[in-house]
Structure formats: structure tokens, C-alpha cells
Amino acid sequence: MDIALLIKAAIMGIVEGLTEFLPISSTGHLILAGALLGFDDDKAKVFDIAIQTGAIFAVILVYWQKIRSTLIALPNEKQAQQFALNVLVAFVPAVVLGLLFGKAIKAHLFTPVVVASAFIVGGFIILWAEKRQQRNPATIRIHDVESMSTMDALKVGLVQCLAMIPGTSRSGSTIIGGMLLGLSRKAATDFSFYLAIPTLIGAGAYSLFKDRALLSMADAPMFGVGLLFSFLSAWLCIRWLLRYIASHDFVPFAWYRIAFGIVVLATAWSGVVTWAE
């Protein structure tokens, strides 16, 4: 058993879990961490997507009571049916656009300028969204996910598609997009987490199926360690974030994104990291 490889898998799992649900782009951080660890071949790229499943188990655990009650009520209660429909409607745009344009995006948009621009522009959008809600609280019209309409969900789903641009952040696009669409910070964050469940499970399953020829049973320990550490770090991160947003905004994450965008350019120009698929 390659202990060094398992340590790398654990580190990558921690990076995935800590960054997947914060509005800072897990993809950008995994690329940087993988380059620094020498863990960036084709198999590692499949690994990066597959270990998102560990983070999803963390979401399911944190929100289990809501998920369980929704599943039980689904056959009879309209509110549960509406909630499930909203998650499904929000999920569909990413599936369609991912299948249509996924290869083209990987071929043309994984460049230092695109990744850095996504980080920096995303940071300024977060600053704007937070300033907008703080200056005009009347823009908040939805305070919980149960109050969302199907059209609200579709709009958030369309915004999620922006995360196909590397460096954008799936959670960042859905949370900040939701806030700009009138959701409270808490409602936008909750819906982003619920939407992550089908989105990331689908992405992980598709990646494993598509690149199954690269994998063997010998890789099971590496994937198992990555999934475990992804789950544990994501669970801690989600619990922390839900407490954080109760009394804080996303402004610190905006400045972090801007700084990280500069790091992307610096590492690319110095040759430390190859920001390409």
C-alpha cells in the first residue's frame, strides 16, 4: 500500500470538503493542491470529481431531518411535492448544458486568465450582492426554501450553469445568484446545499462511468480515503457555515476570491501550476 498516495488522497479530500460548499470554487483549489502535491494526472482528475460524493453525504447528514420528512410527505403533501419539484427543476439546466458543452468548456476555458477572471469577477459580484441586500433589505422576498416558486428554482438552476466556467464556484453561483434573485442569505444557502445533492452525485457518477477504463480495484483505498476525508471536512464546514451566516455576510469570501485570482495568475506565469485540463 502506497502510504504517500493515501496521504495525498486525504489532503485532497480535505481540500474538497472545505471548499465545495463555500463560495470560493473547489475546482480551483483542487487544481492548485494537486499541482503542489504532484497529484494531477488523468486519474487524479477523476478522483477530484468522484470524492465530491463524500461531501454530498455530509449534506445529507446535516439536512437529514428535512430530507426524511420531505420523502415521507411526498406522496400526500403539496409543500413537499413543490420542494422536490423545485430541486428537480433547478437541477435540469446543468444536466442539459453540461452534456452539450462540457467537452468544449474543458477544451477552451481551463486557462489561467479564465480561471483568475472567474475568481476575481465572482469576488466583486459577492461584494455587490451583499451591499445590495444590506442597503435595501426590501429586495429580500423569500426567507425560506419552502416559499420558493418553480420559477425561482429555475432561475437559480440557470445561474448554477455559470459554475461550468472554471473558477466560478457552484455554491457561489447558486448562493449569490439566489440572493440577487430575492432569497435571503439563509434561504439561498439552504437551497444551494439541497441542489448540490443531485448535481454532484450526477457529476461524480458520470465521471466514473466515462473514465472507468482509467480505474482498477487497486485504486479503491485511495478513493476510500479521499471520500472519508471529504465527508468529514465537508460536515464540519457545512455546520460552521450555517452558524456563520446567521450573523455574518459573505464579504470575507469575496476578498479571498480576489486574492486567490491573483495567486492563480502568479502560479501560472511562474510555471508552478498548469491551469489546464
Curated annotation (Swiss-Prot):
Its main location: membrane. GO terms for molecular function: undecaprenyl-diphosphatase activity. Pfam families: BacA. Keywords: Antibiotic resistance, Cell inner membrane, Cell membrane, Cell shape, Cell wall biogenesis/degradation, Hydrolase, Membrane, Peptidoglycan synthesis, Transmembrane, Transmembrane helix. It is found in: Cell inner membrane. It is a multi-pass membrane protein. One of its GO terms (cellular component) is plasma membrane. One of its GO terms (biological process) is cell wall organization. The chain crosses the membrane at residues 3-23, 44-64, 82-102, 109-129, 189-209, 218-238, 253-273. Its EC number is 3.6.1.27. It is an enzyme of class 3 (hydrolase). It catalyses: di-trans,octa-cis-undecaprenyl diphosphate + H2O = di-trans,octa-cis-undecaprenyl phosphate + phosphate + H(+). Bacitracin is thought to be involved in the inhibition of peptidoglycan synthesis by sequestering undecaprenyl diphosphate, thereby reducing the pool of lipid carrier available. Belongs to the UppP family. PANTHER family: UNDECAPRENYL-DIPHOSPHATASE (PTHR30622:SF3). Catalyzes the dephosphorylation of undecaprenyl diphosphate (UPP). Confers resistance to bacitracin. This is Undecaprenyl-diphosphatase. It comes from Polaromonas naphthalenivorans (strain CJ2). The lineage of its organism: Bacteria, Pseudomonadati, Pseudomonadota, Betaproteobacteria, Burkholderiales.
